[in-house]
């Protein structure tokens, strides 16, 4: 109960006292003492209620502050989760791009290997022709066979050079594929790490 109301109650109790200067009798004195005790009891009850109110208000303030901190923590965690999702999405996009590049390199390597096979077959045919001409030249060193031999020999040298260049190209592609696979593994590891719970 608020203190002003208690004061008003005390004033009313004083008004109810007899205005005469004569001493109070037994019943009047008892009634006055009862009113005094009632006032003091009401005052103590009001003070106790006021203390309970202030304590409760303090607890509510602490609870509001705790809820505010909890809400802020939830908000920060939500931001972290959002950033983690964005990072995982970027890693997936990078992984897809790397896989596409690896597929392209694989197709190029297969096409180059096919060309190398054809060149190797052509070179074998050419070597066989050169060997046949060498046999013919043993019997006739001069003449059209010799000129044909020189042409075929030059062609064989050219084919050997092309084969050598293609072999180097295949080796470079293999090195690129190895590097690409290493990069792909790194991205997969990062993606797996990003997906793990904190």
From Swiss-Prot:
Signal sequence range: 1-21
Statement: the UniProt record of this protein carries the keyword RNA-binding: no
Alphabetical list of InterPro entries matching this protein: ANGPTL8
Keyword vocabulary terms for this entry: Diabetes mellitus, Hormone, Lipid metabolism, Secreted, Signal
Keyword flag NAD: no
Superkingdom as given in the UniProt entry: Eukaryota
Post-translational note: Proteolytically cleaved at the N-terminus.
GO molecular function (one): hormone activity
Principal place of residence: secreted
GO biological process assignments: cell maturation; fat cell differentiation; lipid metabolic process; positive regulation of protein processing; regulation of lipid metabolic process; regulation of lipoprotein metabolic process; triglyceride homeostasis
Expressed in which tissues: Predominantly expressed in liver. Also expressed in adipose tissues.
Subcellular location: Secreted
An example Gene Ontology CC term for this record: extracellular region
Induction of expression: In response to food intake. Stimulated by insulin.
Similarity comment text for this entry: Belongs to the ANGPTL8 family.
Quaternary assembly: Interacts with ANGPTL3.
Associated disorder: Type 1 diabetes mellitus: A multifactorial disorder of glucose homeostasis that is characterized by susceptibility to ketoacidosis in the absence of insulin therapy. Clinical features are polydipsia, polyphagia and polyuria which result from hyperglycemia-induced osmotic diuresis and secondary thirst. These derangements result in long-term complications that affect the eyes, kidneys, nerves, and blood vessels. Type 2 diabetes mellitus: A multifactorial disorder of glucose homeostasis caused by a lack of sensitivity to insulin. Affected individuals usually have an obese body habitus and manifestations of a metabolic syndrome characterized by diabetes, insulin resistance, hypertension and hypertriglyceridemia. The disease results in long-term complications that affect the eyes, kidneys, nerves, and blood vessels.
UniProt function note: Hormone that acts as a blood lipid regulator by regulating serum triglyceride levels. May be involved in the metabolic transition between fasting and refeeding: required to direct fatty acids to adipose tissue for storage in the fed state.
Protein name (Swiss-Prot/TrEMBL): Angiopoietin-like protein 8
Organism: Homo sapiens
């Amino acid at each position: 109960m608020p203190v002003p109301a208690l004061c008003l109650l005390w004033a009313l109790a004083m008004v109810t006292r007899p205005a005469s200067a004569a001493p109070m009798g037994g019943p009047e004195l008892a009634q006055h003492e009862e009113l005094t005790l009632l006032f003091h009891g009401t005052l103590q009850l009001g003070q106790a209620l006021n203390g309970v109110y202030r304590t409760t208000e303090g607890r509510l303030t602490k609870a509001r502050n705790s809820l505010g901190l909890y809400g802020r923590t939830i908000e920060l965690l939500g931001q972290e989760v959002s950033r983690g999702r964005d990072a995982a999405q970027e890693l997936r996009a990078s992984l897809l791009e790397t896989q596409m590049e690896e597929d392209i390199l694989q197709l190029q390597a297969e096409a180059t290997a096919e060309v190398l096979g054809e060149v190797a077959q052509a070179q074998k045919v050419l070597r066989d022709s050169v060997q046949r001409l060498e046999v013919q030249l043993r019997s006739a060193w001069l003449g059209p066979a010799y000129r044909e031999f020189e042409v075929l020999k030059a062609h064989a040298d050219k084919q050997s050079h092309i084969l050598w260049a293609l072999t180097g190209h295949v080796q470079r592609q293999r090195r690129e594929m190895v590097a690409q696979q290493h990069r792909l593994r790194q991205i997969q590891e990062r993606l797996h790490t990003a997906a793990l719970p904190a």
